[in-house]
Amino acid sequence: SYLLYAALHYGARARAYYVNSAFQPAFELEDARRLAGELNADMKVLPVDVLASETVTANPPDRCYHCKQMIFRTILAAAEADGFTVLLDGTNASDDAGDRPGMRALRELSVRSPLRECGLTKRDVRMLSRDAGLFTWDKPAYACLATRIPTGQPITARDLAVTEAAERDLFSLGFTDFRVRMVGRSAKIQLPAAQMPRLLEHRQEILQRLGPDYDGVWLDLEGRG
């Protein structure tokens, strides 16, 4: 978000690309469209069928690498067709390159990460975004839906849809910064310890909403964050 703002603020010829796949919840596309509208930015939505890749759906430890390859090759092709020669992404200095297979895909495809290259951390980006008046400045970090499914467990369209619905239900009840992870056919809810009392207050409603899609609903007492 901030990278797009900065590019436009300093007069760069830029176009935003949003990859729409089964791994992204609907609200992410809504937020991207809102941001593009507020910045008067040109944004192109590119559909990518990540579930068509057996390597990705097998969910190996380096799934993110293969998925990033699919995503960024699609963006690169679109950008080249649009007359662009440089592709930038929003990775920042807080992202651990040594622990992310997806980073390898970025390097191999020559995708540049200006925020990271300039040493801007996640906190720096939030503060700069706040100063710029971007609504995304305090938006909780959100990893793709595939991260909710244990490594080695095949990823299916049904599991992704169930996960998205479960997290949407919890969000509608006022919970924030949480994850609903699959453990077998059960749901494990991870959220900050401070929100646990509220979750127990809504216990019956949560069971009614999530129960039909899962064999069980668990609360991770270790909390999140």
Where are these regions (language model features)?
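Short amphipathic alpha-helix segments
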Residues: 157-178, 204
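Internal, active-site/partner-interface "lid" segment
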Residues: 139-159
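Short, conserved charged micro-motifs
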Residues: 195-202
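Short, aliphatic-rich beta-strand segments
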Residues: 180-193
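Catalytic cores of large soluble enzymes that bind and process phosphate-bearing ligands
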Residues: 63, 67, 155-158, 162
